[in-house]
Amino acid sequence: MVQQLSSLRGSSAEALQVLGEQVDGDRYTLEEFAALADDLFRAAALLRSEPALRRAVTDVSTPAEAKSSLVHGLLDGKLGAPAVDLLAQAVGLRWVAARDLADAVEHLGVVAAVRSAGRRESVRLSDELFVVAQVVEENAELRIALSDPVRSTDDKRELLRGLLAQRALPATVALVEQALAGSFRSFHAAVSEYQKVAAATQGEGVALVRVARELTEAERTRLEQALSTQYGRPVHLNIEVDPSLLGGMRVEIGDDVIDGTVVSRLDDARRRLAG
């Protein structure tokens, strides 16, 4: 089952689940998944840039067959058959808002990109996405360049290609580039969401762990095992070292937050004293 998008509600969420069958793990080869991801990202961009088209293919008063024919007429020969077939099916479903279709298509592209890495590389993909997000977050000059509205998307992609420079998986590169062109409020938000999708697609969870000092391998293993037992599935750790926490750790997994840092405990003590 494809991970749900929090922005989709009602019939849009149901439509995404129906379409998720088109990106099941055994449906295509890794190369075919990569091509599908690229096509879906291009389709999402087209839907966002053409409001009239977006409205036409989500108009509930237009028969599904007519909308499907419109998709085939526009995209046959321009995108691969799997992507066109998926889009033709998508426009026959009901969407709460016209923009939901583009968001769902992008999301399915992310899933396809994750599938293109293969299960053996799932941990590496998750790690690479985390590292890229951290590098950008910690490099003010790069962060400003990537958020500069004057710079073209192609220029920003060149900056990131230079950063990755043959070191990252093709799936990582595809997702990082899409993070610049998608619907998220920031590059960091996009990559963080893609990492969650990557974990969910491979049946894993992702825990963001903030600690005051580096964990030993034994400590990492114990924490990983404890969280995996608690959540009933493998949990991958992304660890941030922040000396300002003084000690302890803060764990975020999904909507759950476990804050056992010294700073948090001191803040609690101050509030109790003030009260």
From Swiss-Prot:
<dbReference type="GO" id="GO:0045259">
    <property type="term" value="C:proton-transporting ATP synthase complex"/>
</dbReference>
<keyword id="KW-0375">Hydrogen ion transport</keyword>
<dbReference type="InterPro" id="IPR020781">
    <property type="entry name" value="ATPase_OSCP/d_CS"/>
</dbReference>
<dbReference type="GO" id="GO:0046933">
    <property type="term" value="F:proton-transporting ATP synthase activity, rotational mechanism"/>
</dbReference>
<keyword id="KW-0813">Transport</keyword>
<keyword id="KW-1003">Cell membrane</keyword>
<keyword id="KW-0406">Ion transport</keyword>
<dbReference type="Pfam" id="PF00213">
    <property type="entry name" value="OSCP"/>
</dbReference>
<dbReference type="GO" id="GO:0005886">
    <property type="term" value="C:plasma membrane"/>
</dbReference>
<comment type="subunit">
    <text>F-type ATPases have 2 components, F(1) - the catalytic core - and F(0) - the membrane proton channel. F(1) has five subunits: alpha(3), beta(3), gamma(1), delta(1), epsilon(1). F(0) has three main subunits: a(1), b(2) and c(10-14). The alpha and beta chains form an alternating ring which encloses part of the gamma chain. F(1) is attached to F(0) by a central stalk formed by the gamma and epsilon chains, while a peripheral stalk is formed by the delta and b chains.</text>
</comment>
<keyword id="KW-0066">ATP synthesis</keyword>
<dbReference type="InterPro" id="IPR000711">
    <property type="entry name" value="ATPase_OSCP/dsu"/>
</dbReference>
<protein>
    <recommendedName>
        <fullName>ATP synthase subunit delta</fullName>
    </recommendedName>
</protein>
<keyword id="KW-0472">Membrane</keyword>
<keyword id="KW-0139">CF(1)</keyword>
<comment type="function">
    <text>This protein is part of the stalk that links CF(0) to CF(1). It either transmits conformational changes from CF(0) to CF(1) or is implicated in proton conduction.</text>
</comment>
<comment type="function">
    <text>F(1)F(0) ATP synthase produces ATP from ADP in the presence of a proton or sodium gradient. F-type ATPases consist of two structural domains, F(1) containing the extramembraneous catalytic core and F(0) containing the membrane proton channel, linked together by a central stalk and a peripheral stalk. During catalysis, ATP synthesis in the catalytic domain of F(1) is coupled via a rotary mechanism of the central stalk subunits to proton translocation.</text>
</comment>
<comment type="similarity">
    <text>Belongs to the ATPase delta chain family.</text>
</comment>
